[in-house]
UniProtKB/Swiss-Prot annotation:
Main location: secreted
Lineage start: Eukaryota, Metazoa, Chordata, Craniata, Vertebrata
UniProt GO MF annotations: gonadotropin hormone-releasing hormone activity; gonadotropin-releasing hormone receptor binding
Site (Appears to be essential for biological activity): 8
Name the UniProt record assigns to this protein: Progonadoliberin-1
Record PTM Pyrrolidone carboxylic acid, positions in chain: 6
Cross-referenced InterPro entries: GnRH, Gonadoliberin, Gonadoliberin_I_precursor
Function: Stimulates the secretion of gonadotropins; it stimulates the secretion of both luteinizing and follicle-stimulating hormones.
Site feature Cleavage, where: 8-13, 15-16
Length: 67
């Protein structure tokens, strides 16, 4: 017999269903965490770098929250 597991994070419930009441909170938490990661990357390197994929992800999540 195989073993299965469920990853629980950001409001996920067993079976992959999301808790609709907490979905916006989850998105806002993700945006905050991505922003913190992007800030860390910004300060660690003094060389000019192209736009970070994390910044793009943050922008996409923020636009979803605004809709």
């Amino acid at each position: 017999e195989g073993c299965s597991s469920q990853h629980w994070s950001y409001g996920l419930r067993p079976g992959g269903k999301r808790d609709a009441e907490n979905l916006m909170d989850s998105f806002q938490e993700i945006v905050k965490e991505v922003g913190q990661l992007a800030e860390t990357q910004h300060f660690e390197c003094t060389m000019h770098q192209p736009r970070s994929p994390l910044q793009d992800l943050k922008g996409a999540l923020e636009s979803l929250i605004e809709e």
